[in-house]
Design a protein with these regions (language model features):
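Short, structured segments at the rim of ligand-binding sites
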Residues: 1-425
Length: 425
């Protein structure tokens, strides 16, 4: 059976390059649909989710090519772009249902074509993850929705600006509004917009294409719609979640690691948590340098939240490390209600974890975990199980590798560069 074999107990030492950001790349690829000119997106990670998104763009009629470490997208340049024909906008299949980020095609195709039909997007099984915020916001912009036979249809006869207040700073909803608003008639104001760096990256790309957006990086965005957009070159920032994963790997195993080109300015909540666990984090022109003792300290209370708070995507990695910390820690999950799924496999390794409800986990650190056979059921939890295996005594084997490959270019190669005994088999 395909999986990842790990011989644990080795400290991590050395330097690893951090890949481009998955969560920035995907909405930017969607945004390339808003112009007829070619765009070149540099520093794209070669991960499963990006390959799936490229497949979707090609199905819509775009010419998409990998060039060195980037992707060239040519959506127009022909008399009739197929995505402007209704039959080509019925998006189905694993690329849609297996990837939550496919939802950003909703705003992009409404902005370009005014109509789209797609299966409900999927992704990792970590809660209900409703799309009501997206639908309610776009309805205010003149979009009509119809749900039938598992398909979501959206049509906008007159896509127009609106004043939209988000009751929660949803990254996906903010991105979908942005993608639709830059092509809408009039101005759109988003109050309560998400502050995540990936939203800022999308705004930067759109403005590089000629869009007019005020308030970038703030909770209120003003989009002046109706601008003609053009192609551009843009470099995707590095992935703060991948950097955080390897940071926690270093803390769990002990050692010293240079996270080359890590976006440390976007990782303050993560480095604060790391230092509470006993690590030392130092920034330089090269990136983020992490030194960790042999055994981490308990953190007391750690809660996830929207940026700039501690990211939910690193909660599982933190849990894996805290199972080996001195003392008792409590994790409070405030984004998704079902993100403690790795607790059971960790307990199978000897961890002491008590789940109070779907939101709280109390962890009493043990001195050592023991190697085990585990199954990854989602992206970030799968990566966290790899970290647990690295720190455990003996051999571990993690199946469900395809989940991990959705977000990590080559986690085994990267960790081997740091001295880990890990191989994909």
């Amino acid at each position: 059976m395909k999986g990842i074999r790990i011989q644990g107990g080795m400290p991590l030492q050395g330097k690893v390059r951090i890949q481009g950001s998955k969560n920035a790349t995907l909405p930017i690829l969607a945004a390339t649909l808003l112009t007829n000119e070619a765009s070149y997106i540099q520093n794209c990670p070669r991960i499963e989710d990006v390959h799936r998104f490229v497949h979707l763009l090609r199905e819509l009629g775009c010419m998409v090519h990998w060039q060195e470490n980037g992707i060239r997208v040519q959506p127009g340049g022909r008399d009739d772009l197929p995505c402007e024909r209704a039959e080509a906008r019925r998006m189905r299949g694993e690329a849609i249902t297996g990837m939550r980020s496919s939802l950003c095609l909703l705003g992009a195709l409404l902005g370009r074509c005014g109509y789209v039909t797609m299966e409900h997007p999927g992704g990792c099984v970590i809660g209900d993850r409703p799309i009501d915020l997206h639908i309610h916001a776009l309805e205010q912009m003149g979009v009509e929705f119809l749900e039938e036979d598992g398909l979501l249809s959206a049509r906008a006869k007159n896509l127009h600006g609106a004043r939209i207040t988000l009751k929660f700073p949803s990254v996906g909803a903010t991105e979908n509004i942005l993608l639709a608003a830059v092509k809408a008639t009039g101005d759109t104001v988003i109050t309560g917009a998400a502050l995540e760096p990936e939203v800022i990256a999308l705004c930067e790309f759109l403005t590089a294409c000629g869009a007019s957006i005020e308030g970038i990086g703030s909770p209120e965005l003003i989009i002046h719609g109706g601008e003609d957009l053009h192609g551009t070159r843009y470099t995707v920032p590095t992935d703060r979640i991948v950097a955080g994963t390897y940071l926690f790997g270093c803390i769990g195993c002990g050692g010293s690691v240079l996270l080359n080109q890590a976006p440390w300015r976007q990782m303050e909540a993560v480095t604060v948590a790391a230092e509470r666990m006993g690590a030392q984090c130092t920034v330089s022109e090269e990136g983020l340098f992490v030194q960790a003792p042999g055994r981490p300290k308990s953190i007391g209370h750690l809660q996830t939240g929207p940026y700039p708070e501690f990211p939910t995507d690193l909660q599982s990695a933190a849990m894996a490390v805290l199972t080996m910390a001195e003392g008792i820690s409590c994790i409070e999950e405030n984004i998704f209600e079902n993100r403690f799924r790795i607790a059971e496999p960790l307990k199978g390794m000897g961890a002491e974890i008590v789940l109070k409800d779907g939101r709280h986990a109390v962890i009493t650190g043990v001195e050592h975990l023991r190697g085990s056979r585990m199954e990854a059921c989602e992206l970030r939890g799968g990566a966290a199980l790899v970290l647990a295996g690295l720190a455990a005594e003996g051999e571990s084997f993690v199946t469900g590798q395809h989940f991990i490959e959705r977000g990590y270019e080559n986690i085994c190669r990267d960790l081997r560069e740091l001295g880990a005994r890990i191989i994909s088999v």
